[in-house]
Structure formats: structure tokens, C-alpha cells
């Protein structure tokens, strides 16, 4: 039985509220779950203690039993110090594309030429 530690949505429209639950991965998002570990309220301030209320010991037990946290729950557990996530980087996405690099090189060359022409020859 593939277990996941994931978020189950509650609350009203545009007022989300999530329960952190352990559930079979084949069950619906808000469907049957095995155990409730805590709550996550994304509308609270990020530094609020009530934003994430979670039983860390139960979470550790379920992870030891083989339950896999989803990405968002892993981030919440990392914030509480229960789990350590590996740092993710996407360096190629930040690089400018080919045409932008060509434009930057051309503008740098033009600026260099202008600086050389403006500087008095001594």
C-alpha cells in the first residue's frame, strides 16, 4: 500500500485550509485517510506559529514506516526541522536566451566603444 503524507483541502471557496494526513496514494485528495498529523493554514502570516501545527513525532514514525511526503509537505516538514530536503537549483532557467545574450554583448561592445571615444587621448 503506497502511503503518502499529503494535504487534504478544506475550507470555503478562496479560503483554503489544509489537513496534513497520511493516506493511500490511490485515494482521492479529500478522501479516506489513515491518520491526521496536523493542519496547515496558508492564510496565516508566514511567521505565525498557528500557520503549521503538526505532530512531528507521528510524522517521523510514518516516514520511518515508508510514507513519502509530497513536495509541499516536505517543505513544511523541513521548516519545522523534522525532515531535511536537498536544495534544488535550476541554473539553466535563469540564464538569458541566445538572442538576449547577443543583444547584451552588442550593447556592451557599443558602450565600450563610446567610452573609448569619449576618453581624451593623453
From Swiss-Prot:
Lineage at the top is:
Bacteria, Pseudomonadati, Pseudomonadota, Alphaproteobacteria, Hyphomicrobiales
> Keywords, A to Z?
Ribonucleoprotein, Ribosomal protein
**GO MF annotation, one:** structural constituent of ribosome
One Gene Ontology biological process:
translation
Report the superkingdom from the record: Bacteria
Region listing for Disordered, in residue ranges: 87-122
This entry carries the following GO cellular component terms, namely:
cytoplasm; small ribosomal subunit
InterPro entries on file: Ribosomal_bS16 (IPR000307), Ribosomal_bS16_CS (IPR020592), Ribosomal_bS16_dom_sf (IPR023803)
Question: What is the recorded name of this protein?
Answer: Small ribosomal subunit protein bS16
Fetch the Pfam families from UniProt: Ribosomal_S16
Coiled-coil ranges (or none): none
The record ties this protein, via PANTHER family, to:
30S RIBOSOMAL PROTEIN S16, SMALL RIBOSOMAL SUBUNIT PROTEIN BS16M
Which PROSITE patterns does the record associate with it? RIBOSOMAL_S16 (PS00732)
Composition bias of kind Low complexity appears in 103-122
The Swiss-Prot or TrEMBL record describes its family as follows: Belongs to the bacterial ribosomal protein bS16 family.
Amino acid at each position: 500500500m503506497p502511503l503518502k503524507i499529503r494535504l487534504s483541502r478544506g475550507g470555503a471557496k478562496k479560503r483554503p485550509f489544509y489537513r496534513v494526513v497520511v493516506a493511500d496514494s490511490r485515494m482521492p485528495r479529500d478522501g479516506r485517510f489513515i491518520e491526521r498529523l496536523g493542519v496547515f493554514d496558508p492564510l496565516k502570516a508566514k511567521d505565525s506559529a498557528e500557520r503549521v501545527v503538526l505532530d512531528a513525532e507521528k510524522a517521523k514514525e510514518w516516514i520511518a514506516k515508508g510514507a513519502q511526503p509530497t513536495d509541499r509537505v516536505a517543505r513544511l516538514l523541513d521548516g519545522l526541522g523534522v525532515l531535511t530536503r536537498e536544495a534544488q537549483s535550476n541554473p539553466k532557467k535563469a540564464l538569458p536566451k541566445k538572442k538576449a545574450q547577443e543583444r547584451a554583448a552588442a550593447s556592451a561592445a557599443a558602450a565600450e566603444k563610446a567610452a573609448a571615444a569619449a576618453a581624451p587621448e593623453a
